[in-house]
Amino acid sequence: MSINDDISSDVMRIRDADWNKRSGSKVPSPGDVTLSNGAVEIDATYLYADMANSSRMAKELDRRVTAKILKSFLASSSRLISHFGGTIMSFDGDRVMGAFMGDAKNSSAIKCSFSIAYSVTQLIRPKFESKYDTVKNAGFKIRHATGVDTGTVFVVRGGIYGSNELISIGRAPNLAAKLSDLREGEYTTFATKSVYDRTNKLQKQRLDGSSDIWEKRDWDFCDENITIYRSSYWRKPGSN
């Protein structure tokens, strides 16, 4: 068969297939979902962490230094997602996506986001600025943003045999990714009202009990005005 026959066959086969869908109580692994027509529907909270200024890093810094910064960000973010009970779903260049399930999924995702903010602002940025003058004197600061949303997600496998991965389809992963693109001053965590309302009290206040860590605002998404909450707060892992 020619390549045109192959892709035409793929499109028709996928279009005409009936989904073999089931509800999931945990985040599926690729082996849990058949490539042909498998799907798992889950209720999950998605976290999307994105390193800012990566294009400027690539332009202004030695590529070996840029690679170290990005690797540090992805390593620490991935470790924190796993630490707080999440599952790493995918990487996309300078971004990582995690999914959290269970009764505490929203609080766990927010705790994770606060700890990612700690790793960037209190570890990665100062440690690289202290070692490399080019980073310290660059026309930008090492920074990031994390978006968090929750909802029902349709998980399928995309790609071809031998080269495929899970794809998360739904508002939660899409909106979390869009929120991670926001660059608003020192704010690092952006969460939807759905997440904020279901997050426990400890993630709405500082360790000393003061409750000024979140700011409510409206945001336009796909022609819809939605309520989001943003925070510049960070918390060292293990503090609470």
From Swiss-Prot:
Lineage, broadest ranks: Bacteria, Pseudomonadati, Pseudomonadota, Alphaproteobacteria, Rhodobacterales
Organism: Rhodovulum sp. (strain MB263)
Reaction it catalyzes: UTP = 3',5'-cyclic UMP + diphosphate
Family as reported in the entry's similarity comment: Belongs to the adenylyl cyclase class-4/guanylyl cyclase family. Pyrimidine cyclase subfamily.
Domain of life: Bacteria
CC terms in the record's Gene Ontology section: cytoplasm
Residues at which Mn(2+) 2 binds: D50, D94
Localisation per UniProt entry: Cytoplasm
EC number: 4.6.1.26
Domain Guanylate cyclase: residue ranges: 45-180
Gene that encodes the chain: pycC
Protein name, per record: Uridylate cyclase
Keywords: Antiviral defense, Cytoplasm, Lyase, Manganese, Metal-binding, Nucleotide-binding
